[in-house]
Each structure stands twice: as C-alpha cells, then as structure tokens.
Regions:
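An extended, acidic
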Residues: 134-248
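Short loop segments at secondary-structure junctions
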Residues: 99-103, 113, 122-125, 131, ...
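N-terminal subdomain of lithium-sensitive/metallo-dependent phosphomonoesterases centered on the IMPase/IPPase/PAP
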Residues: 1-79
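Acidic active-site catalytic centers that drive phospho-/nucleotidyl reactions
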Residues: 38, 42, 61-62, 77-80, ...
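Residue-level signal for inorganic ion chemistry
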Residues: 15, 38, 49, 82, ...
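DPxDG-like acidic metal-binding loop motif
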Residues: 68-127, 144
Length: 248
C-alpha cells in the first residue's frame, strides 16, 4: 500500500506545478483533452510500479496496457477531471487501483489541490488523510444528496427517464466533478454518485474504497465491479431504493 500512496501523492504534487498555469492542451482521438501534466504524472506512477512490481500489469489512460494477461493489474488515471484541471477547478484527482484476478484489492484517490487522500485496502477499511471513514447512515431517500457528472449524458446514454426519477425522489442533486463525487460518498459527505459513462481506470480505486467504507460501487443494475462502463457509488442502506429508481 505504501508504494501506491507515495506514487499517487508524488504524481499529484507534480500536477500542481502545472495547475492554474494555462498549461497547453492537446486533444486525443475521442476529443478528450490531455496535457503534459497527465503524461508526466502517469510516467511517474508507472516507473514506481515497474520498479516495485515488475511482474504486474499496468493499464494507464495515457500509455495503454503493459504485460497484458498478468493476474495483478494496476489501473492509472493520472488526472481524472482534466477538463476541470485545465480551467483551474480544484476537484481533479490522481487515481490508482490494483485488481487481482478480477477483484480490486486496494486503491487510492488523491485530490492534490485539496490535499485530500482517500484510500482503502481489502479488510483494512477506508481512510481520508489517515482517518477511518464510513458512508452516511441516511435511510430516507427523500433526504439524500445525489451527485452526478453531466446531466445531459444521462439522455445520451439512454438513462434520461431514470435520472428524472432520481431527481424527483431525492433531496438535492449537486453536480460534483468526476471522481470527487465518488469520494464524497465514501467519506460520508454525499449519499450517492451517478456516472453513466465510466472507464475502468476512472473506476478502479472506488471498487475497494466504497465497499470498505460500507457502501456499494458498481453498475446501475446492482452488479459490483469496475468494468461496466458506468458507475454508481451509494450507501448500502439506500442501494435498494436507487436500484428501483434506475431500473430500465
């Protein structure tokens, strides 16, 4: 775990050297933005992992897959929320998760501009800056705060009706940025977070951070995991209600 935490922390501090500086932006084939900070942060994390775990596979957003087929696979998102990063919004994150034979067993999400580190390891709980944290104990959906990434994306991915049901049934729907919303659920500051499109490198750390905090992370149908191309973080108490609202 120490290698993971140090790599994520140091990569995050590296990104702060570019944050708020008007760093140049390029665009990938899918029109998503990338900066030199994304590239250098991933290179730093990769170098640490390769030195410590030479037999492990690595899946990174910027540099692809190495040692495909390895039983141990690290997922790196060097800057989750690049669009926020390039505009000086402090809610971006550096994400890292380890999957062993299909199960995420440890993960970390570091928010450099906030200096918040959320991490978990299987059987050891979830921690925020070293303090144990748990999901909220809310049992009434009508009092729940539910975060989301982009409201329009629910329509684009055929989830518009489900999203409208969630809006009607819940107390408040703040549009928290990307990984930060999932971290807010794990640390007891939000009851649920919905993301209708999510890659494995975006999701990986939350596959262990949420369960170890007493919550759920998985798809909108109740299947835990990081490979569904969508993601929901929610407290265990409110999971049945959220699944009912999201039912197609």
């Amino acid at each position: 775990m120490q290698v993971c935490l140090e790599a994520v922390h140091d990569a995050g501090r590296l990104t702060l050297g570019y944050f708020g500086t008007g760093v140049g932006v390029d665009y990938k084939g899918d029109d998503s933005p990338v900066t030199i900070a994304d590239v250098k942060a991933e290179e730093l994390i990769r170098s640490r992992l390769e030195a410590a775990f030479p037999d492990h596979g690595i899946v990174g957003e910027e540099h692809g897959v190495s040692r495909e087929g390895a039983t141990h696979r690290w997922y790196i998102d060097p800057i989750d929320g690049t669009k926020s990063f390039i505009r000086g919004v402090p809610l971006y994150a550096v994400l890292l998760g380890l999957e062993v034979e299909g199960e995420v067993v440890l993960g970390a999400a570091y928010f450099p501009a906030l200096d918040e580190m959320v991490h978990a390891a299987k059987g050891h709980g979830t921690h925020l800056n070293g303090r144990r944290c748990m999901v909220r104990d809310t049992t009434d959906l009508a009092r729940a705060m539910v975060g989301f990434t982009d409201a329009a994306s629910f329509e684009r991915h055929g989830r518009g009706a489900a999203w409208r049901r969630v809006m009607d049934a819940t107390y408040h729907r703040p549009g928290w940025s990307d990984a930060y919303g999932h971290a807010l659920v794990a640390t007891g500051r939000l009851e649920a977070m919905l993301d209708p499109i999510l890659n494995a490198h975006d999701a990986a750390p939350f596959g262990i951070i949420l369960p170890e905090a007493g919550g759920y992370f998985g798809d909108f149908a109740g299947n835990p995991g990081i490979h569904a191309a969508e993601g929901m973080s929610v407290t265990a108490a409110l999971l049945p209600d959220m699944l009912r609202l999201l039912e197609a």
